[in-house]
Amino acid sequence: MTEYKLVVVGARGVGKSALTIQLIQNHFVDEYDPTIEDSYRKQVVIDGETCLLDILDTAGQEEYSAMRDQYMRTGEGFLCVFAINNTKSFEDIHQYREQIKRVKDSDDVPMVLVGNKCDLAARTVESRQAQDLARSYGIPYIETSAKTRQGVEDAFYTLVREIRQHKLRKLNPPDESGPGCMSCKCVLS
């Protein structure tokens, strides 16, 4: 069974733990209890493949930022979460992404941008802004509500699909013989 190491990152209070617990335990936690670091495991079937999700729910508080490099090193894919009613959390996404790329020493790291709390009417980050940011990063964008469960499975499962595609790209790198060239080789005698 394939195991996927997923890491949930984002500013404090955006609902990282609520999303993770909603996926794992099917219930909404509405009291805010700041996380230092929690790990969860769940067996799921995604696109016909049984797999084990190893999910690391991380601290959003700045005082725990020193721990980030360590879990970023081991993570295969990252849910970058902001709250749609918190513009600052959206602006912080860039820093998380840059730190992930630096620690992984790669521009090609599986990520999904997640706009959480979409059940709330008091939106300060428009869908279009988030879609534009995700497009500029070349990653998917999914809106979720940990409260109603909307998009929760989709966010985590999309990240697993991104990891799978990343692994395939590493196994079969694109042919770099130039534009317009086919990958077949000719031998003239």
From Swiss-Prot:
Give the protein name, as stated in the record.
GTPase HRas
> Domain of life of the organism in this record?
Viruses
- Where is this gene product found? Host cell membrane
List the catalytic activities from the record: GTP + H2O = GDP + phosphate + H(+)
Regarding activators and inhibitors, the annotation says:
Alternates between an inactive form bound to GDP and an active form bound to GTP. Activated by a guanine nucleotide-exchange factor (GEF) and inactivated by a GTPase-activating protein (GAP).
From its record, what is one biological process in GO terms?
signal transduction
Place the motif Effector region on the sequence: 32-40
Q: What is the native source organism of this protein? A: Murine sarcoma virus NS.C58
* Prodomain residues: 187-189
Family to which the UniProt record says this protein belongs: Belongs to the small GTPase superfamily. Ras family.
A Pfam family name for this chain? Ras
What Enzyme Commission number(s) appear in the record?
3.6.5.2
An annotated GO cellular component of this protein is: membrane
Q: What is its main location?
A: host cell
Q: Which GO terms describe its molecular function?
A: G protein activity; GTP binding
- List of residues binding GTP: 10-17, 57-61, 116-119
| Topology of the protein relative to the lipid bilayer | Lipid-anchor
Instruction: Note the SMART domains from the entry.
Output: RAB (SM00175), RAS (SM00173), RHO (SM00174)
Q: Which UniProt keywords apply?
A: GTP-binding, Host cell membrane, Host membrane, Hydrolase, Lipoprotein, Membrane, Methylation, Nucleotide-binding, Oncogene, Palmitate, Prenylation
Lineage of origin: Viruses, Riboviria, Pararnavirae, Artverviricota, Revtraviricetes
Q: Where is the lipid attached (S-palmitoyl cysteine)?
A: C181, C184
Give the sites modified to Cysteine methyl ester.
C186
* InterPro entries documented for this protein: P-loop_NTPase (IPR027417), Small_GTP-bd (IPR005225), Small_GTPase (IPR001806), Small_GTPase_Ras-type (IPR020849)
- Which PROSITE patterns does this chain map to? RAS (PS51421)
Q: Where is the lipid attached (S-farnesyl cysteine)?
A: C186
